[in-house]
């Protein structure tokens, strides 16, 4: 949730819509609890009996984020919850249990007293530890927070350890985040929303401490109620009256009953007059009821109006509907009216704030402004991404998810190929892919997946003798049941030559997060793999092969352009002999054009009659036949 009162809707106009390539090469901090709760709930809604959806979601999302999007994820685990968040936790428990929310503690003090020693849900904690174990086998860095996970994500982003945060909690900005990705869909053509603090500052004029002040007024996870009568718009208007450096100090003054604005003689809010008892603006000078300008109607009829005589020849022109006088007297009266209206509004909201006890809550302010959220006294460690431990990973997922080892190895191939290409780009290693079994062969073509271009890379197996030496699980890890696969140039589909009927997918849960299964080309001599790889990464890892492919593409485009130009020229020329069989004929050679027969004009400018007399009395079908005879 984060900040209450639809705070995301207030920020939505300043969101940037980025594509899948935005995260390539960037470090991103992922709020692990957000993935475990939100995506697991979505899978259970589709398949209530899904087996450990939190592990399945994390596995495929991590593979997609690392290999398809090219990001470097850093996962953050929640620590002990703050007692200030007890009301939100209780409300979630009540909603999940179907209980009446009216039984919730009415005050923050009651909720905090009951929640001081309450740990997190044991089942949820077990789920998180399973996810941490899986991430360690995948080689991903995992950091533990003292309290809220989004607080540590924001700290990593603010200190430059990561480039963005992936979380749905809007209070990440209050913890210091600079870039927040709210929702990330890997297999979707639609761009995702990315919020930059710089855009919010330029659009709304809000900085970190001003957002903290808004959370105190509107409410948040640490104070559900906030100040009565404050919504996002009212809170925004109020905090914009102060600078970031003194906005919290002004809230302290108002909480103590001191009016913070100048121009009012009463220093205490209780001594301020109510809006209804304040004096009205001074009456303006008399104006003509006919034209609306300064003066009166009698004098204008007799001597004329100085303003009307400038714009017209009449002495006094009747004022139009919605007329607004722009004389100095009226401008001053309007300004005074707006000033009094703003003063009345300021007094009203200040009285609402002063009526709250223990406002502002200093614990909430310190929680948001704290920059020490890592559960490690030595500070943020060096972030490294290691190679996955395949043997332990296969055993873990086989036990937890009941997956076949071949299925696991197939899904891991995009991640392994990405790691291999990164190593080749950085050090030009002489090793091969998949335990030195496959080497880079060629680039087949450019492939568009979800609006992003990729290289379709062909990997060749080094020796066929290695297949017989592999264990059964590794021997079939990529070949599967079908040996003959045809790669189509036009579509991103794999077609089995022996089986034409569509096969049913046995996986009952949502498949949108799964990466593409590698394609296998197997013949009597060689075995090949086809994978989708990032274009820039392949160019850096194998520059010679990439340059050769680009030259071939340019030659193909040049030949295609030359062939099309020849066809266009041949279509306008009159054939003098038999045409080649490969040249498409013009449709005008088969059907006579009526426009060509009647296009010439006589000397008198009249058009010649057509060779075929199309009588209006003939049926339409007969006239059509006569036209082409």
From Swiss-Prot:
Residues 601-614 have a biased composition (Basic and acidic residues). Highly expressed in anthers. Expressed in roots and leaves. Its EC number is 3.1.-.-. Binds 2 magnesium ions per subunit. They probably participate in the reaction catalyzed by the enzyme. May bind an additional third magnesium ion after substrate binding. Disruption phenotype: Plants develop abnormal anthers with degraded microspores, causing male sterility. GO terms for cellular component: nucleus. The keyword Glycosyltransferase does not apply. Its cofactor is Mg(2+). The keyword Nucleus applies. One of its GO terms (molecular function) is double-stranded DNA binding. Keywords: DNA damage, DNA repair, Endonuclease, Hydrolase, Magnesium, Metal-binding, Nuclease, Nucleus. Residues 221-421 are annotated as: 5'-3' exonuclease domain. Residues 2-98 are annotated as: XPG-N domain. It is found in: Nucleus. Mg(2+) 2 binds at residues 169, 171, 221. Residues 136-225 are annotated as: I-domain. It is an enzyme of class 3 (hydrolase). Belongs to the XPG/RAD2 endonuclease family. GEN subfamily. Endonuclease which cleaves flap structures at the junction between single-stranded DNA and double-stranded DNA. Possesses both single-stranded and double-stranded DNA-binding activities. Involved in early microspore development, but does not alter meiosis or tapetal cells development. Possesses Holliday junction (HJ) resolvase activity in vitro. Cleaves HJ at symmetrically related sites of the branch point. Monomer. Interacts with PCNA. PCNA stimulates the nuclease activity without altering cleavage specificity. This is Flap endonuclease GEN-like 1. It comes from Oryza sativa subsp. japonica.
């Amino acid at each position: 949730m984060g900040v209450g009162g639809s705070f995301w809707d207030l920020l939505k106009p300043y969101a940037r819509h980025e594509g899948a390539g935005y995260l390539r090469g960037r470090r991103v901090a992922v709020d692990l609890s957000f993935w475990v709760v939100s995506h697991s709930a979505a899978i259970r809604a589709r398949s209530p009996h899904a087996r450990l959806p939190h592990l399945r979601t994390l596995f495929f999302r991590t593979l997609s984020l690392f290999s398809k999007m090219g990001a470097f994820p850093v996962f953050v685990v929640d620590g002990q919850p703050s007692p200030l968040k007890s009301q939100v936790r209780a409300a979630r428990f009540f909603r999940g249990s179907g209980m009446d929310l009216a039984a919730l503690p009415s005050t923050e003090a009651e909720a905090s007293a009951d929640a001081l020693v309450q740990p997190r849900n044991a089942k949820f904690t077990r789920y998180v530890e399973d996810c941490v174990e899986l991430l360690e086998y995948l080689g991903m860095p995992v950091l533990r927070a003292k309290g809220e996970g989004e607080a540590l994500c924001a700290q990593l982003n603010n200190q430059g350890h990561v480039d963005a945060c992936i979380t749905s909690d809007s209070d990440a900005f209050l913890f210091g985040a600079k870039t927040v990705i709210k929702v990330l869909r890997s297999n979707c053509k639609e761009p995702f929303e990315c919020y930059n603090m710089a855009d919010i500052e330029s659009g709304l004029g809000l900085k970190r401490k001003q957002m903290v002040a808004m959370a105190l007024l509107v409410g948040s996870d640490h104070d559900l109620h906030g100040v009565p009568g404050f919504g996002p718009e009212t809170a925004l208007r109020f905090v914009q009256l102060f600078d970031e450096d003194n906005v919290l100090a002004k809230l302290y003054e108002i909480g103590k009953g001191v009016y913070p604005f100048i121009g009012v003689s009463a220093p205490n809010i209780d001594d301020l007059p109510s809006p209804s008892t304040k004096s009205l603006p001074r009456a303006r000078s008399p104006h003509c009821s006919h034209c609306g300008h300064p003066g009166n109607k009698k004098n204008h009829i007799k001597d004329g109006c100085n303003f009307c005589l400038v714009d017209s020849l009449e002495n006094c022109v009747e004022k139009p509907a919605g007329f607004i006088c722009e004389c100095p007297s009226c401008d001053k009266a309007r300004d005074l009216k707006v000033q009094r209206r703003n003063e009345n509004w300021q007094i009203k909201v200040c009285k609402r704030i002063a009526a709250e006890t223990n406002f502002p809550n200093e614990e909430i302010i310190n929680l948001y402004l704290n920059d020490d959220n890592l559960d490690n006294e030595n500070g943020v460690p060096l972030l490294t991404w290691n190679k996955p431990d395949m043997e332990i990973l296969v055993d873990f997922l086989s036990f937890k998810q009941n997956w076949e080892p071949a299925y696991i190895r197939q899904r891991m191939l995009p991640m392994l190929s990405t790691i291999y290409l990164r190593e080749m780009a950085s050090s030009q290693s002489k090793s091969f892919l998949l335990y030195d079994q496959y080497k880079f062969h060629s680039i087949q073509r450019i492939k568009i997946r979800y609006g992003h271009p990729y290289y379709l890379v062909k990997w060749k197996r080094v020796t066929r003798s290695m297949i017989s030496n592999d264990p059964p699980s590794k021997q079939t890890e990529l070949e599967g049941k079908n040996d003959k696969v045809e790669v189509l140039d036009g579509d991103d589909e794999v077609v089995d030559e022996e089986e034409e009927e569509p096969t049913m997918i046995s996986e009952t849960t949502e498949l949108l997060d799964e990466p593409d299964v590698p394609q296998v080309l197997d013949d009597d001599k060689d075995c090949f793999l086809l994978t989708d790889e990032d274009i820039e990464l392949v160019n850096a890892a194998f520059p010679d092969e990439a340059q050769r492919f680009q030259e071939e593409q340019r030659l193909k485009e040049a030949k295609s352009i030359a062939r099309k130009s020849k066809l266009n020229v041949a279509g306008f020329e009159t054939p003098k002999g038999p045409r080649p069989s490969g040249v498409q004929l013009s449709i005008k050679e088969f059907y006579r054009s009526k426009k060509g027969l009647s296009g010439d004009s006589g000397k008198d400018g009249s058009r010649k009659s057509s060779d075929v007399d199309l009588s209006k009395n003939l049926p339409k079908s007969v006239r059509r036949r006569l036209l082409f005879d």
